[in-house]
């Protein structure tokens, strides 16, 4: 048997430390779920539930985090003007822990989330589900890009989309991408 010296173990980067937090269930009440539980690989599970972080008590779908650094404001109601505040609230209230996270933990999570490039549009070549050119024409004619601006298909402000939330009297929402 030969030994191959590989050198010293490198120090983990902020991104690696953030990934450890993101995938660890030890940061949640009872130790049974993690950020990854609702954002698999940084994406979205597609289920609706109340995350508690935005304080409205209403169910909503956890968003995809790919490219999220570029999509201010954060939360459905735009409550968070910085991603640091959103991540801190998620680590504290959504994960149901008794004390707020350290600034270092928030920075590490941000480094990990910042490494998640925007997802390419989903396209199933076996079942394209319609005419993409016609869809693009409808998108343009309906002026969808007014609220869903390329390249991230969102805008940095809230929009009245004609829906009234009777529980918190909210009329303006953060346009999802």
Task: Describe each model-derived feature in a short phrase.
Residues 1-177:
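Periplasmic c-type cytochrome electron-transfer domains
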């Amino acid at each position: 048997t030969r030994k191959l010296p590989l050198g010293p173990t490198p120090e983990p980067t902020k991104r690696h430390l953030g990934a450890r937090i993101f995938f660890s269930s030890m940061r949640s009440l009872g130790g049974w779920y993690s950020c990854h539980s609702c954002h698999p690989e940084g994406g979205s599970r597609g289920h609706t539930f109340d995350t508690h972080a935005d304080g409205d008590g209403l169910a909503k779908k956890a968003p995809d985090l790919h490219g999220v650094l570029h999509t201010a404001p954060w939360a459905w109601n735009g409550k968070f003007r910085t991603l640091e505040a959103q991540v801190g609230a998620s680590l504290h209230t959504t994960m149901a822990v008794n004390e707020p996270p350290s600034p270092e933990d928030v920075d590490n999570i941000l480094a990990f989330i910042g490494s998640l490039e925007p997802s390419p549009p989903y396209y199933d070549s076996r079942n394209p589900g319609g005419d993409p050119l016609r869809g693009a024409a409808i998108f343009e004619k309906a002026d969808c890009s007014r609220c869903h601006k390329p390249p991230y298909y969102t805008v940095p402000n809230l929009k009245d989309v004609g829906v009234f939330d009777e529980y918190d009297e909210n009329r303006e929402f953060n346009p999802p991408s």
